[in-house]
């Protein structure tokens, strides 16, 4: 209830609101280049940014990219109706895995364009096993998927409203290299040597990385695995 009262206080009577939703910080990085480009092309429009997780909200609640930043209330019929009626967005963009069915239904019902961006689908997901879940995707105006496999999966259940646009995190990373944040500890560790940094790695990534490290001992490496329990194992394998 606090979210709704706080939201109403700032968006009431506002116009041209475009709503972006990210689950967490990683999804925000995927959405960031899209928001930046949108603001550049539509300077009079206002950006509402919502998060599901505290990690995303707490770090980005004061971002200059958005006019307002909020948590997204739970995906219930009443919450979806209330939120959308309050915000009255002219278009909505959800990043990657985010499919909130009640919100999607209400957006479709009110003829508000809804875009799923940097989307990635995999075999075994409920959308490709059960008709009810596949039906929910009909509420998406257009999918911008990361890869050909995702496009093939959508096509296999009768969808053609998709574009293969890649992973927008690459756009974000390229932009970050033009204005890098200096980290003293990393600079000290690098000692003017080429340093390769790998973040949120998975087991399959690490198999390739370990072989690469063994073949290129002249470099320094910083690896932050997704599973923290794997740190000691990586240290042993890489002689780190």
Language model feature labels by segment:
Residues 2-6, 11-179, 197, 201-203, ...:
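Active-site and donor-binding regions of nucleotide-sugar-utilizing enzymes
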Residues 223-240:
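Catalytic donor nucleotide-activated moiety binding site of glycosyltransferases and closely related
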Residues 34-41, 207-218, 237:
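Short hydrophobic signal-anchor/transmembrane segments that target glycosyltransferases
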Residues 152-153, 184, 208:
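Short, solvent-exposed alpha-helical surface patches in well-structured domains
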């Amino acid at each position: 209830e606090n979210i709704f009262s706080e939201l109403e206080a700032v968006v009431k009577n506002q116009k041209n609101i475009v709503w972006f939703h990210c689950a967490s910080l990683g999804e925000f990085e995927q959405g960031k280049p899209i928001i930046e480009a949108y603001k550049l092309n539509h300077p009079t429009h206002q950006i509402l940014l919502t998060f599901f997780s505290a990690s995303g909200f707490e770090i980005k609640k004061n971002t200059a990219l958005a006019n307002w930043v909020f948590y997204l209330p739970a995906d219930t019929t009443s919450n979806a109706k209330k939120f959308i009626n309050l915000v009255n967005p002219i278009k909505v963009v959800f990043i990657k895995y985010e499919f909130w069915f009640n919100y999607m239904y209400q957006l479709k019902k009110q003829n508000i364009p809804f875009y799923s961006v940097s989307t990635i689908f995999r075999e075994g997901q409920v959308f490709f096993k059960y008709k009810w879940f596949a039906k929910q995707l009909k509420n998406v105006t257009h999918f911008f998927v990361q890869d050909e496999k995702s496009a093939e999966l959508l096509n296999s259940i009768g969808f053609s409203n998709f574009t293969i646009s890649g992973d927008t995190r690459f756009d974000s990373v390229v932009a970050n290299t033009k204005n890098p944040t200096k980290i003293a500890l990393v600079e000290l560790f690098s000692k003017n040597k080429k340093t390769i940094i790998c973040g949120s790695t998975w087991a399959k990534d690490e198999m390739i990385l370990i072989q690469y490290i063994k073949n290129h001992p002249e470099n320094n490496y910083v690896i932050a695995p997704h599973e923290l329990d794997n740190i000691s194992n990586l240290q042993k394998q890489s002689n780190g």
